[in-house]
Amino acid sequence: MKKTLLGIISLAFLFILAACGSSSADGSQTVKIGVTGSDGDQWPILKEKAKEEGINIELVEFSDYTLPNQALANGEIDMNSFQHIAFLSQYAKENGDTIVPIGSTVIAPIGAYSEKIESLDELKEGDKVAIPDDPSNQARSLRALEAADVIKLADDFGQFGDPSKIVENPKNIEIVPVVAQQTPRVLPDVAVSFINNGIAGQAGLNPKEDPIYLENANDDSITPFVNVFAVNKDDENNETYQKIVELYQDEAVKEAVDKDTSGGSIVVDVPKEELQKHLKRLQEEE
C-alpha cells in the first residue's frame, strides 16, 4: 500500500511539473518559447535575465507563421512570441479560443519597400504590389495603401478585409499576396513589397530608414498590431511565464530591441487585461 501511495504522489508531482514547463535537478525551470526569428541581442539578453531568476529559456524557431500556435496548442512549446493581437484573433476564429495573450512585446509599423521607386506616388499603371498573405497583415497593408491614396477600400472593410474590398484602384495596381517570409525575396519582381519589420531586419533591410512608406505608429487603428507573448488559456496565470513577460520590459532588453531593429520596433507595456479586451473585441467584430 505504501509503495502504491508513493507512486501516486510521484505521478501527481510529475503532472504538476509538466503543467508549468520542465524543471531540472538544480531547481531551475526550462520554458520553451516559439519564435519566427531569433537573430540579434534581445533574446540572449532576455535569456540571461531569466537565468538569474532560475528560468532557462529555450527558443524554438519556426519558418512559417502558421506553426507556432499549432505547436503551442499541441503542447510542444510553453509560450510563443511572434504575433500581434489581430493575427491571434484570426487564429482563434479558425481554431477556437484556446490561446490568450499575457503580455506585450513590441509594436512595429509595417513598411513598404521598393528597389524601383522612391515613393508610392510613383506607382504606375498595372504595377505589382506584394503584401503578406495572412489575413491580418494583408488587411494592414491594404489600409496603408489607402492611407497613401493609392486605393480606396469599402466602408465594411473591417479588421480582416481582403483585396476584394478595394472599391477604387485608379492605377489598376495588381495586389500580389505572398507568404510573409517571402515578401523580401519578391522585391526584384514587384514595384513594392510590404514587409513586416522582423522579416525586414532578417533580410538585411533597415526597417526605419529603408521603407518608402511607413505605417503611422501613433494611429489608434494599429493598436491591434501590438505583438504579444501568448500561452494556452490554462496557463495565463502561470507565475513563471508572467515573470518572463516582466523581464522583457527590462531596459537592457529595450535597448537591444532598438538596436536589433534599427529603431523600427518599440517595446510597449500593455496590461494583460487590455490585450485580452482587444482580442475579444476583434473576435466580436468578425
Regions found by a protein language model. Name each.
Residues 21-23:
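Bacterial signal peptide processing site
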Residues 26-38, 55-61, 127-129:
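Short, well-ordered beta-strand elements
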